[in-house]
């Protein structure tokens, strides 16, 4: 039986240099070490986000089940270098992830992506299908615009407003619609997120510059989803006010080998709001 280990951000923190468009980027990642298979966790695009901040409730469950867990800070977030993206952010993240995996000598990995991370996982699967084991997509994956909710959604408007005016008040406004139960957003969590945001004002400024240069950072790959043959698990929050539920349905319609699970009483952060059930669901899916 595998010993239960509690992993920390500091103990798993590492860096790698990756070439992107002729520029060398220093990319931060967390790595739990050797495992039977590799599981890569890709975070969303919110201000102050990082691999660890998005998935700290999930790391131990996967690592203690025998997986090597890697959490990548995408360029422009966390401890990675900042960047202005004038093209597809999804494809940029996919290329950087390939560079990270190449450097680490990892030929194949399962990808778990939340929001922007889902978009990036889909872009990676389209460009490098032979490198993907299974896909797990939560609240993202470029299924196209909602058919029922005007775009940009309430949550995306608040997210973009927070980037432009990074205050505690605006952070609270965004987090209050980020999850189903806003009372779980403690003052400590909000302060930590605010500190993470303000520690890297270059990330905030470059995100706004990127939006100005190209408002469509995450292109719609809905018409190409049928090319992805990897088994996929699509997970959504019924009450997601950032990326509505019908976008998840479009993913399932497009992906030829997909399953779909909806959490009730859940917003945009399924892996955090329903961590225990989420963790077991992924382990069951990966073990099939």
UniProtKB/Swiss-Prot annotation:
GO molecular function: 2-hydroxy-6-oxonona-2,4,7-trienedioate hydrolase activity; 2-hydroxy-6-oxonona-2,4-dienedioate hydrolase activity; protein homodimerization activity
Catalytic activity: (2Z,4E)-2-hydroxy-6-oxonona-2,4-dienedioate + H2O = (2Z)-2-hydroxypenta-2,4-dienoate + succinate + H(+); (2Z,4E,7E)-2-hydroxy-6-oxonona-2,4,7-trienedioate + H2O = (2Z)-2-hydroxypenta-2,4-dienoate + fumarate + H(+)
Domain named AB hydrolase-1: residues: 39-274
Domain of life: Bacteria
The protein's role, per its UniProt record: Catalyzes the cleavage of the C5-C6 bond of 2-hydroxy-6-oxononadienedioate and 2-hydroxy-6-oxononatrienedioate, a dienol ring fission product of the bacterial meta-cleavage pathway for degradation of phenylpropionic acid.
Protein family membership: Belongs to the AB hydrolase superfamily. MhpC family.
Record-given protein name: 2-hydroxy-6-oxononadienedioate/2-hydroxy-6-oxononatrienedioate hydrolase
